[in-house]
Amino acid sequence: MTDTTAFITLENISKQFPGVRALDDVNLTLKKGEVHCLAGQNGCGKSTIIKVISGVYQPEKGAQILLDGKLFHHLTPSLSAHYGIQVIYQDLSLFPNFSVTENIAVNRYLPGGDIWVRRGAMRQQALAAVKRIGVTIDPDKKVEKLSIADRQLVAICRAIAADARLVIMDEPTASLTRQEVNGLLRVVNELKAAGICVVFVSHRLDEVMEVADRISVMRDGKLVGTFPASELDSHELAFLMTGQRFHYSPLPEKPPVEQEPMLEVRHLSRKDKYQDINLSLRSGEIVSIVGLLGAGRTELCLSLFGMTQPESGEIWINGKLVKLRNNHDAIKHGIGYVSEDRLTQGLIMEQSIYDNTIVTVFDKLHTRGGLLDHRKARTLVDNLIRELNIKVSDPLLPVKTLSGGNAQRIAIAKWVATHPRILILDSPTVGVDIANKEGIYQIARSLAEQGMAVLMICDEIPEAYYNSHRVLVMRRGRLVAEFNPHRCREEEIADVVEVINE
């Protein structure tokens, strides 16, 4: 029988930062051989409690940590590692130019490990870890050559090779396809069967419900409670996380009209990226594209924004054939594009919220003398912050000080500032908690109600189903199906994607 006795118990855990009480008297027990999900919005304290467990942060006085039967008042990174606590962060912290073997066995050859590098022993250790979770990875392959999913498995193998007894996974599925997610969840269950405690952090509530034995919900630095997963559903979990009830129903149906499409794509192709794409998008309409990672969705959007060139086909805007040679052409034709990667492509994280918001309209905010009209610019920024409901204490602060949800709203605001007729949103809710997801989709709905045409890439079928007038499915560079949410069930779209997945 699986051992479910406590591996670590945290009592009276508080953590204060200047002006913020990140943890407020949290009590948490993690058991051997269980999958324990930490759920909560961004900023609720999940990352802080993980850093207390891994010894990065020391809690305030009065804390007690019972780790494998021994009492501590705080942990250190080396002490946590000694007891088998391993954290797999979103960036995975792998060495891309090292082989799979070297990454898995690296802990033995860091300071405090063996002096001599024994290649044969390293390989045996790596193969044993790979075998233990039942996967197949080439031990000699450089990590930089691996898919994100395989890198995730390498990080798990490294934890196992370090004799992990508690593995904490922070947003492990954020960049994985559904098939890869299924593979990862199978590995998580293998770890559980081996008596290892797995702490699983994810914004995807369906995955949480699928894999968890117990769920601890955090809100505003406090533990709301710990619940058997069998006693919750995703709607109740969302309520516990946010204190709000979300009512989901498809958007009001848009009746067919003879209105000319705002955007029309005819037989658009780019070698090895997408083939024979035909789609239309009308004023006031939200159309989503779902599909697997690598299906060509982002590549198509990049061409619609002039960043890459199709080899054949046509793009029509407001009934006129256009040639989008670059993004400047796209902007002139009224197209805005919110990138899937806000950290490196969507925002300049070190620059201010103010600068990020006006960067797309900088040339329109000058006085006749050529100087920036700060009054006009500040009015624009203030209006956008208010209209998009962005929580900002001071627009002159760096955008990196914002939460993920508010940073994403700034990425949208900078394009709304251009008054586009067509707005492309590429995976706008990646890494965003449930309340902010709803807020971002409310922005999309509001923009559509104002007459904007919105094209979205969605990674989660429910999000597309409840926030689109039409849902398109893309596979291997081709659009293969179209759904009207008022004439189908959510499961029908999922079934098509699952068929595509096989």
Residues covered by each model-derived region:
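Glycine-rich phosphate-binding loops of nucleotide-dependent enzymes
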Residues: 2-502
